[in-house]
């Protein structure tokens, strides 16, 4: 739809001519990944020095905004199949409009991806959705994603699958990102709230925990500040720069959950000295029921 283009224009009827505005418009149109960024050429027409007016026409060439990935392979005694769908110009408002399916609703500049991977001993699937202009008036980006991994015990010698041993990992995240005006509008601040749940049953080989039965949870908040002026092609930029600083942290559970972690640490040391792996697993299940960390 045309408004997906119009909202990125820095040159509007009645505006004073600005070379910077033209260059920025070319960059923003290239960042959409809906057009060939190498061939966005502004043409100047009907220049009138007396009236101080000029018409600017942007020549755009659409590129494929959707991708389909289908892969199959064999390894470790198992067939592995992958299906991934990506739509960079999706239209969720037409999701229930049968006439909009050609083959899927398109035109609103939203991004939707779906992925599936399956083999004899694991399967994983997920989706993500991004709305770059939530509400349609301000460049506030909304995103949501979901993923699920199911893995079972597997012998690489006999190629046997043991479904009595399994781990499920479920994750979901919601994010908001806003374009800033100060110091300049290349800056963006983003907030993301994410949750992951680990559910283990007789599964000793995950590598994250010492216990093989139990569950663990991770609720984390991520804040990032970025500046990206690279372009016009987002994949092969020819100018500009990009940097990001971020912090990820969880709630300080140890301050209010009334668990004596010092005592647990001492008990774990004792169990470790005695070679009591079962007690170590019990202690670690309590220690890591809710993960607590920060990362800069």
What are these regions (language model features)?
Residues 243-253:
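Acidic helix/loop microenvironments that form the catalytic cleft of cell-wall polysaccharide enzymes
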Residues 4, 295-296:
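Non-catalytic alpha-helical scaffold/packing segments enriched in small hydrophobic residues
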Residues 1-13:
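N-terminal periplasmic "start-of-domain" segments of outer-membrane beta-barrel proteins
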Residues 15-244, 269-278, 293:
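Gram-negative/organellar outer-membrane beta-barrel architecture
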Residues 205, 255-257:
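Extended, well-ordered alpha-helical segments in internal regulatory regions
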Residues 257-288:
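Solvent-exposed loop segments that connect transmembrane elements
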Residues 250, 289-294:
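Outer/extracellular conduits and scaffolds centered on Gram-negative outer-membrane beta-barrels
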């Amino acid at each position: 739809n045309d408004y997906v283009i119009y909202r990125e224009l820095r040159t509007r009827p009645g505006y004073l001519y600005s070379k910077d505005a033209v260059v920025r418009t070319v960059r923003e149109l290239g960042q959409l990944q809906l057009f060939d960024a190498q061939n966005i050429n502004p043409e100047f027409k009907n220049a009138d020095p007396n009236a101080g007016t000029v018409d600017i026409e942007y020549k755009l060439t659409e590129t494929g905004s959707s991708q389909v990935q289908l892969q199959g392979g064999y390894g470790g005694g198992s067939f592995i199949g992958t299906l991934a769908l990506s739509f960079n110009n999706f239209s969720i408002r037409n999701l229930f409009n049968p006439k909009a399916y050609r083959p899927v609703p398109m035109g609103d500049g939203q991004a939707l991806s779906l992925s599936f991977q399956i083999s004899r001993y694991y399967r994983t699937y997920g989706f993500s959705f991004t709305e770059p202009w939530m509400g349609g008036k301000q460049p506030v980006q909304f995103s949501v994603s979901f993923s699920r991994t199911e893995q079972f015990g597997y012998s690489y010698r006999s190629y046997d699958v043991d479904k009595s041993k399994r781990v499920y990992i479920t994750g979901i995240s919601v994010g908001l990102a806003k374009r800033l005006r100060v110091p300049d509008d290349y800056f963006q601040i983003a907030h993301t709230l994410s949750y992951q749940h680990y559910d283990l049953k007789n599964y000793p080989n995950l590598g994250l925990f010492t216990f093989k039965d139990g569950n663990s949870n991770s609720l984390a908040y991520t804040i990032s500040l970025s500046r990206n002026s690279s372009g016009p092609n987002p994949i092969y930029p020819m100018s500009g720069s990009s940097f990001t600083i971020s912090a990820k942290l969880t709630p300080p559970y140890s301050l209010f959950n009334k668990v004596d972690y010092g005592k647990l640490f001492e008990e774990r040391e004792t169990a470790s000295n005695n070679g009591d792996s079962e007690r170590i697993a019990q202690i670690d299940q309590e220690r890591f029921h809710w993960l607590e960390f920060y990362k800069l």
